[in-house]
């Protein structure tokens, strides 16, 4: 467990998260308006989104399915009966004067997610609920020095709000939870998880306490937009609360904003309670009733999820848990790996994938989907190394050409004349030449200077332009030098 070091001793973090995940859907939660990102302001607004009188909301079935699939991925209970409520508050970018949400009867409850801790153990984080709600519009303050403008393109887009219990005990655990949740949503296809574009936003509820004491007063940090900022915001806010408590002051329950430039949080507004929002069932929407048949159908069509892939890679491919987690962290990488792993040694493939390929992708600032090397050609390269057709050194040269051109490795080897020399007669001839040319070094090696062995290997490789089979060279050299 992580602690905050105060002037009067240690304090514990108590953290709960609320994740707002924009549902991957072509249309909004209650209207047919488009959800395309970065469209011209107010170009994707229906009468419902603009809260024009007389227009009734119609629930988007696809958004409901996405929420159910996410709930199944979180090992949660799917409520067969849920209700939409009106959350009443006034804000300029909320034209209805209320947000349609689910307060009393959410669609999903009681899920769990396991995250790795600093000790290497797994920790279970309880998911209190997942509910459906509409997003608000966007206030724009940088268009004029005198006026603010409203863009309603985002208004009405479907969100899943995923709320944890206060089970998180450090900023790093919070970051791990968000990373793992984001990966799960991407595998399911229910949210793209792009925090930079705002399609996934994180609110953190933070309090501090002495070990064994009751929960303290919490403050909520709104709309944290990156994994790195989650850690920074929680660290700063917890330290701020400790400083106040140690100086004899009280924590005021409030909503705060995190400034990424200064690394500080500041007051946004006093924290509201549920009563302030005057929740009541939306009279324009019927209760949502979900059948067992629908739940079972969606469950049967779920893709293989990250934890399942990690288990498969460690068992079927004998990868370490760490390597499996690195590959599974990106669905596209996992898909690429599986296509190649069926054609070559998975462990050797993993080494080349996570070192050489990742290095080149980072250098070129591209994703694996843009890589010119097909999984099949990558597997061919690994097999050529495995069967000693080429050495590791030659393989790196071949790989670089493959990355630039997309050519098959065997074609490159043929064009460049890079086939590894594994003929004993040819290698013995070269070794005899090296020994004859270096009598003093031979005498030195035979008198106990073992480090000279590397010199002989280097000379053989030089004479063969690096094409000699290094394993065979070592074996033949030892035989020649010891005779």
UniProtKB/Swiss-Prot annotation:
Q: What class of enzyme is it?
A: ligase
Q: Which GO terms describe its biological process?
A: glutaminyl-tRNAGln biosynthesis via transamidation; translation
Per the record, the gene is gatB
Name under which the protein is recorded: Aspartyl/glutamyl-tRNA(Asn/Gln) amidotransferase subunit B
Origin species? Rickettsia rickettsii (strain Sheila Smith)
Q: Which NCBIfam families match?
A: gatB, PRK05477.1-2, PRK05477.1-4, PRK05477.1-5
Among SMART domains, the record links this protein to: GatB_Yqey
Q: Which UniProt keywords apply?
A: ATP-binding, Ligase, Nucleotide-binding, Protein biosynthesis
Disulfide-linked positions = none
InterPro entries annotated for this entry? Asn/Gln-tRNA_amidoTrfase_suB/E, Asn/Gln-tRNA_Trfase_suB/E_cat, Asn/Gln_amidotransferase, Asn/Gln_tRNA_amidoTrase-B-like, GatB, GatB_C_1, GatB_Yqey_C_2, Gln-tRNA_amidoTrfase_suB_CS
């Amino acid at each position: 467990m992580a602690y905050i070091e105060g002037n009067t001793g240690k304090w514990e973090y108590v953290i709960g998260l609320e994740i707002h995940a924009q549902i991957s859907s072509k249309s909004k939660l209650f209207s047919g308006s488009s959800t395309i990102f970065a469209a011209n302001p107010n170009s994707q607004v229906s009468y419902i989104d603009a809260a024009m009188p007389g227009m009734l909301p119609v629930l988007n079935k696809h958004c409901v399915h996405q929420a159910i699939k996410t709930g199944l991925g979180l090992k949660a209970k799917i409520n067969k009966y849920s209700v939409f409520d009106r959350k009443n508050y006034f804000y300029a970018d909320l034209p209805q004067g209320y947000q349609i949400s689910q307060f009393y009867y959410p669609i999903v409850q009681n899920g769990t997610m396991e995250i790795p801790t600093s000790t290497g153990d797994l920790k279970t984080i309880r998911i209190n609920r997942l509910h459906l709600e509409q997003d608000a519009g966007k206030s724009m303050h940088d268009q004029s020095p005198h006026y603010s403008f409203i863009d309603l393109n985002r208004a009405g887009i479907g969100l899943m709000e995923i709320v944890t219990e206060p089970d998180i005990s450090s900023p790093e655990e919070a970051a791990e939870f968000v990373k793992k949740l984001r990966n799960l949503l991407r595998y399911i296809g229910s949210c793209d998880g792009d925090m930079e574009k705002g399609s996934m936003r994180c609110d953190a509820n933070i309090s501090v306490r002495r070990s064994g004491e009751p929960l303290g007063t919490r403050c909520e940090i709104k709309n944290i937009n990156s994994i790195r900022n989650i850690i920074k915001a929680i660290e700063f806010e917890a330290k701020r609360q400790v400083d106040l408590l140690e100086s004899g002051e009280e924590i005021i329950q409030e909503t705060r904003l995190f400034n990424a430039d200064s690394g500080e949080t500041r007051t946004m507004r006093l924290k509201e309670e549920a009563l302030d929002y005057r929740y009541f069932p939306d009279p324009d929407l019927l209760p949502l009733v979900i059948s067992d048949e629908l739940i079972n159908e969606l469950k049967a069509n779920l893709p293989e999820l990250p934890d399942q892939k990690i288990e498969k890679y460690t068992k079927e491919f004998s990868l370490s848990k760490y390597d499996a987690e690195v590959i599974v962290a990106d669905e596209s990488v996992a898909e690429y790996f599986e296509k190649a792993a069926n054609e070559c040694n998975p462990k050797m493939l993993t080494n080349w994938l996570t070192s050489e390929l990742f290095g080149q992708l980072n250098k070129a600032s591209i994703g694996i989907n843009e890589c010119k090397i097909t999984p099949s050609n990558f597997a061919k390269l690994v097999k050529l190394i495995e069967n000693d057709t080429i050495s590791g050194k030659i393989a790196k040269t071949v790989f670089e050409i493959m990355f630039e051109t997309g050519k098959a490795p065997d074609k490159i080897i043929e064009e460049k004349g890079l086939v590894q020399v594994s003929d004993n007669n040819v290698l013995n001839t070269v070794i005899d030449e090296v020994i004859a040319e270096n009598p003093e070094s031979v005498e030195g090696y035979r008198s106990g200077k073992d480090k000279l062995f590397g010199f002989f290997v280097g000379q053989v490789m030089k004479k063969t332009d690096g094409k000699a089979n290094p394993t065979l060279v070592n074996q033949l050299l030892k035989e020649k030098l010891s005779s």
